[in-house]
Amino acid sequence: MSEYIDEIAIKVSSGNGGDGATSFRREKFVQYGGPDGGNGGNGGNVYFLGNNNLSSFKDISQKKYFKARKGGNGKGSKKNGKNGEDIIIAVPLGTEIINIETNKLICEVLKHNEKHLIAEGGKGGLGNAIFKSSKNQAPRKSTSGKDRVSFNLNLNLKSL
């Protein structure tokens, strides 16, 4: 007989944004190469997806922490970092998602393939090529990626 789980507590975290790069163009016979640092990639998001083939939280009960990937760092030659991979958590229809810290209902999953963004990934940092201007033609400034967002959640399955 299969196990039926209708309430579960989990932690979800989005991914950090990647850092922007500080880099300058260096080539043979190019004496003064300008700034060419790329931007960092965005961190991965965490989504909940309604699935009418599921009837309990048995599939996700073994894993208590879901973390999306970090965005890649920028590189020279204006190469932007790769965006972090998203995580999609399939839940049965009728799932209530409640933030444990605030005890507030975030959302309800009521339809098949209904997708809810729960934790948005951090924004990627800017490379020094972005900060180039007529007054500052060789900026040594780049920004770090934004931090991730984490939530402790309680998932309740209500009968439909």
Regions found by a protein language model. Give the residues of each.
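Conserved P-loop NTPase architecture
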Residues: 1-160
